[in-house]
Amino acid sequence: MELLLGRDVLTSPGAAAQSPGGDPGRSVKLRLALLSFLMLFVELALIRWLGANIVYLSYYSNFVLLGSFLGIGIGFLRARSRINLFPWTPVALAVLTAFVLRFPVQISHTSGTQLIFFGALKTTGLPTWLMLPVIFLAVAAVMAMIGEGVARTFVLFKPLDAYRLDILGSIAGIAAFSALAFLNAKPLAWGIITAVTLLVLSGTRIGILQFAALASLAGLLTANSLISHDLWSPYYRITVGATTKAQTIPVMVNGIPHQAITAAAKRPAIFYQPYTQAPRNPLNNVLVVGAGTGNDVAGALRMGAKHIDAVEIDPMIYKLGTKLNSDHPYQSPRVSAHINDGRAFLSQTKKKYDLILFALPDSLTLVAGQSSLRLESYLFTLQAIQSARAHLVPGTGVFAMYNYYRTTWLRNRLANTLDVAFGHAPCASSVGQHQQQLSVLTVSVSPAAVDCVSTWHRPSGVLPPATDDHPFVYLASNTIPSFYLLTLGLILLASLVLVRTVSGPYRKMTRFVDLFFMGAAFMLLETKSVVQFALLFGTTWFVNALVFGGVLLAVLAAVETSRRVVITRPQLLYGGLLLALAVAWVVPADSLLSLSVVPRFALAVLIAFAPIFLANLVFTQRFRDVGDSTVAFAANLLGAMVGGVIEYVSLITGYRALLIVVAGLYGLAFLTGRRKLTAAKAETGAVPPTLTARSASTAAT
């Protein structure tokens, strides 16, 4: 176990340059799998932890993701460098942790007219222009060090053998992090797992400085956990404040005021307008989406609701409501609580409701791994409101929603969505001013079922409803906001400079330009899968984890296939991939919502994962015989980073159009890789049969 416990896998550049020979041994295999586990685990931990401490990153989760891809790509480019940076990983992690704990940031600055982020507050800590570049470069540095450790072991294997072990380690990493999310584990647990893994990989060769850094990392996270008393859900860092003079309990998420637990009797009258404006509503069945800590559930009970389905996506927020809400709404026998996504709940139930209430559903965060999709995005599309309408009792059912909508154009957009979905204008009331203005929109299947105090009047230039394909309700126009463009431009510029500095002339990667395009395309394909499953089954952390796990399993299946089978006509794979993308285009995700859960799941898996499997067959058939696996893999990773940037095009086109971009990128991969395909065909002595089966050992030669 000497290699696993810390012996340098490469002692010189010359060793790295040697072609992989026989079986490197069990200990080296374990080391590569463990390094890959560490790489994905740390990446996920950084996305969660940095987003919780630097509020701006809650809305830019792929900012850290892009830095991670850049860093890992640079690490692979350094696989043959004389100086090994992997042993410095503990120091880099400790410094990054100390920096963030010393300078936590709450950022509210946006363009103000193009995009709304709820929870906006004044900035604290270091200015944005300084903090974001520092975090991006720090993440890239940490991941480059870990990536270099992976690459120095990766190069000892035949390409597909190494890729297989990398995927197995990654699957273990996402499984471990998902288990910690299920247990509501604090960052201390993430830090301990990271530190122990680094200790195992370093073994007896760990230096005093590295050991001190690991101890500091654990100490910093321990002290922070003991001092802050923060709770961690699968979505947020949650802080419960002291009871105020008004007898409310403030709840903050990721450093932003989110809820205030208040007795139902003390809530302003405007919260009860959905009831007072529908005095003839029997309230036999009420659905509250965004039930939170129970304020709105308690209000429904107070107004006489006979049964309430309370839907809350965050299990920790729900638990706080059961413990701290003085009205104890969740303990009522008239209340059934559901930990689920609101849109998913609507698609899974057949019940009819007298009142459906969207009560302040404001996630303050994005779906992990996706740049622009918030947890509540699919609640406010036209199709979502139409789904809610279909679940109302015919004739008398009432739908209502309220929130601090911050701007007039957003309030009008949502009112217009109700107008289109129900065929007539909703009741509209507001109290307060500017960003503290609370607005209530109420509408019924039958206009006679509600008594409006004031009715919404359509202004000129009102925005159209958001749709399931373009669910960006907080985006005022189909464009990429200027602050996104500036940030992405700087990321690309920094990446070009760093890659050139580390690897020298770009021409060493030009022979793998087709793999670069494959990486960009696959990133978009993965994004489309995340979005599709979020629509069909909810934006919960569990669905997200299953999707990423499913993607890795599809990749593993492609690797195992390519280790055993040589496809002598890869053009057929490209044709099959194009066909699978065409099917995904012809069968949009929302067309599956009418199906029951089992057939919906089966078709969703087939439509989403068939292109992923075929795309990875294309990649692995090309990757299997590359002469320089680490540079080839780096090109693919850097392509994935560029794909993460291209992903923002969905703000203009919607998600469905990403399939066209994916097809175009794979077309470029085919055109730029034709010479390699011809060479591979000649090497295998191509004969009429399309597939040539081989043993696992022969297939990787």
Short names for language-model regions:
Residues 1-701:
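Alpha-helical transmembrane segments of multi-pass membrane proteins
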